[in-house]
Amino acid sequence: MHRPLLPCYLVLLTSLVSAGEAIVIRASMAVTPIIESAKPLIVSKYPDASFKITPCGTKASIEAVAGGTAQLGATARKLKDDEKAAAPDLILTEIAKDGVALVVNSANPVTNLSTKQVVDILTGAVTNWKELGGPNGTIAPVGRTESNAVVEFLNGVIGVEHQVAGEGKDQGMLYKAKGAVAFGSLKVPVTGKNLDALAMVIKDPNGFTFLPLSVAREAKAKGSTFSILNFNGVEATDANVLSKNYLLSRSLYLLTKGEPQGVIKDLVTAILSPEGQKVVAERGCIPLR
């Protein structure tokens, strides 16, 4: 069962109105800013409500709601068949549209990458920007840790598989095109935080990374300088994300076990309201209406 959503983190909401019950919300990095900004929309009804936000991945969010340790979650994808089978009473509510941005340093003249070119960068088949119409410089990709929803999403769109290599600070990702026998020799360094990946690219003229479009837009609005590339010749505009002409487009969802009730229901309703959808836009996502 689906309805409209936004980005993901851990939100602990304590409402004295509900007899002190602690309401735990697990949400992604993309959705957390929306939840924070939507709080004033329900404060008059729940003046004693307080929020504590901690980050989590989509998988962790789903597991928390399914397992009863969180009353509200947020995901950047639909539920998988095994997740539905394990918890058939989970309900997704779509609240926003978002995308995945392909990002390079502002000094890089490259403006577009095709599906094959992104695959070639991640697998190490192409290692120099001059092979892609850019300057003579070794491409320095920055990947994301496995728990980040953008990894699975991007893999599915461009048709690659990954394998974790190394541990701790030495951890990275090996990539291969689906159907290929062997993984590429390039170990793509990874980070768990979107803004860390972005910071690396901002500092490195040869950098390349991918992250939620909403995060990239917010960073630009705050003054960060970098370039968001077109993908297969299509710009990541609101219209192109909504129409899915920009292939790296996705929906954001809130997740509950059964129909939302009480404070959670009002929070979901507030985010879906015209005022809430304005908040969605202010936080870099694309409103549903």
Residue ranges, per PLM feature:
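Hydrophobic alpha-helical transmembrane segments of integral membrane proteins
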Residues: 3-4, 29
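Bacterial N-terminal signal peptides
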Residues: 4-15
